[in-house]
Amino acid sequence: MRLCDRDIEAWLDEGRLSINPRPPVERINGATVDVRLGNKFRTFRGHTAAFIDLSGPKDEVSAALDRVMSDEIVLDEGDAFYLHPGELALAVTFESVTLPPDLVGWLDGRSSLARLGLMVHVTAHRIDPGWSGCIVLEFYNSGKLPLALRPGMLIGALSFEPLSGPAARPYNRRQDAKYRDQQGAVASRIDKD
């Protein structure tokens, strides 16, 4: 059962759930908290690679990712990031979120943005118990026009679901946590699997 607005506020007040900066009451809805777009992005470079062999040797996968992923792009206040039709880009939320070991989070896009062709997550919308950091956004423009995305705009909504008990292996305590304390648009670390 997902937390309702009253419970989200109570968990924030008690410090069991942390969203920094804390959202104003107007952004805490019936069962979600609106989140904003941060200013860090990452894209695919122009490249000539025919494919990336995701099951290949780790050093080859790592080298291929280095060739195709851009450095992190940091926008200044007022600047826009243009996502063209058919393009994938990574970004992060403005807010940093910390979940306790007995709570899982879910990221959903906004219907108003989806109606323009913007997907805010390709498949990974679960936020593991014990997570701490900004939430990665996997943007895809399935529309017909470029979309101007500006830091600070409302970009998605988080909901939270209590677990039957605390996780034995919360994300922040796992030795193999590839994205622990992520603050920027971190590229895929599939080579660390």
Curated annotation (Swiss-Prot):
The active site consists of 138
Write out the residues that bind dCTP: 110-115, 128, 136-138, 171, 178, 182
Q: Where is this region: Disordered?
A: 169-193
Which reaction is recorded as catalysed by this protein?
A: dCTP + H2O + H(+) = dUTP + NH4(+)
Recorded E.C. number(s)? 3.5.4.13
Pathway the protein takes part in: Pyrimidine metabolism; dUMP biosynthesis; dUMP from dCTP (dUTP route): step 1/2
Q: What GO biological process terms does the UniProt entry carry, in alphabetical order? A: dUMP biosynthetic process; dUTP biosynthetic process; nucleobase-containing small molecule interconversion
SUPFAM superfamilies named in the record:
dUTPase-like
Query: Which EC class is this protein assigned?
Result: hydrolase
Q: Which PANTHER family match?
A: DCTP DEAMINASE (PTHR42680:SF3)
Subunit: Homotrimer.
Q: What is the documented function of this protein?
A: Catalyzes the deamination of dCTP to dUTP.
Regarding protein family, the annotation reads:
Belongs to the dCTP deaminase family.
Protein name per the record: dCTP deaminase
